[in-house]
Amino acid sequence: DLIRKKQDVLAKWMALEVGKPLAEGKAEAGGSADIFEWNSEETKRIYGQTVESRFEDTRVHVYYQPIGVVAALTPWNFPLVLSARKISTALAAGCSVIVKPDVITPGTVMELVDICRESGVPPGVVNLLSGDPPSIASQLISSDIIKKISLTGSTRVGKLILKQAADKVQRVTMELSGHAPFIVFDDANIEKATDMAIAAKFRNNGQVCISPSKFYIQNSKKKDFVNLFVEKTKKLKIGNGMDADVQLGPMTTKKRLTEIEELVEKTKQEGAKVLLGGKRPSGFNKGFYYEPTIFDDVTDEFTIMKQEPFGPLCPMLSFETFDEVIKRANNHELGLASYICTNSMEQAHRASEQIETGTVAVNTPLVAIAEAPFGGIKQTGYGREGGSMAIKDYLNVKYTHLGIKG
């Protein structure tokens, strides 16, 4: 309840630290509250087992115990909801937690930690450490106190953390980089498909691990989809996230803006046609703003199809057959999220089963919700956050073989 009551404060923190529009910040606060509510109910569903023993004079009991202190390492792009996932799951499992936010977003996470304490969480149960990321992460992972690590970050950082955690055989949950395909079949409603693409792609200006980053449109619908997508994207308002009607804020850092500009130039050099954007917007002398950019004449060999854009860049490609697009979409080392637009239930099921990602959104832009397990496969990591599966990663399994005769 306190998260919802303080959603305006939390949204302002995210607007100031990330550049996120206020409406998106409020939505993130609502999603964070949902996650706390879900995990508060999960405490009732940590079921043990009584197993029939093969011996008549013994009994077998299986139960769960808290794993211990958790180190939660969170990124800057969704500082509130990603911290909420880790903190609420740890609390539900009976674990204390030390949160290390990104150096860009300590204020947002500090506000959440204060809300936990204000809600009655005992002192020392939810803690925050902010500062130099490599130093703090190394100290946490090398500590004998830490029994579990939960990381949301890049695949590069995940591999480094995993190597360090291996020394102590610490349990690790990792949600890492993504490169999400957005597939539009020829039976899809193009009006709805473009709305879905806008909502999924431009959340946090594309600085999202589940943001669609390669658009595959079946041949007969490509022209109509691209034209309508360009038309709708033009109408998005860019500006200061603190302004109520803004839909797209800036890139969060100068480094992020520079990387986007370099990738755009690389894509153009490789032969892509810019249909929209491709530059900083006029009238913005300050800030790290960049226009939503839509490319055509892109092939699967382009750099942008291999490197996670993590920004408002949209390469458009075409395909002929179902088997072809699934094969092309799966031809990547990352596997976090994918999006499918189709009016065929049979095609929706086949695509969901065959595409190699941990989460699939069919005819909806929503991927991560409180009641479902969120995470990836391949080099996107392992373990899940959300749903009924997440809490098991914060628990140890123990069984007792009990003799009942003296």
Where are these regions (language model features)?
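Aromatic/hydrophobic pocket-lining residues that form π-stacking "cages" and hydrophobic walls in ligand
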Residues: 36, 86, 112, 161, ...
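Rossmann-like NAD(P) dinucleotide-binding subdomain of oxidoreductase/dehydrogenase enzymes
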Residues: 48-192, 319
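Residue-level signal for inorganic ion chemistry
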Residues: 14, 36, 94, 126, ...
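Short glycine-enriched loop/turn motifs at secondary-structure junctions
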Residues: 123, 176-178, 208-210, 244-245, ...
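Conserved C-terminal structural/oligomerization subdomain of aldehyde/semialdehyde dehydrogenase
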Residues: 146, 183, 237, 264, ...
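Long amphipathic alpha-helix in the N-terminal Rossmann-like dinucleotide-binding domain
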Residues: 1-8, 22-46
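Short linear capping/connector segments at secondary-structure termini
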Residues: 13-21, 51-57, 177, 243-249
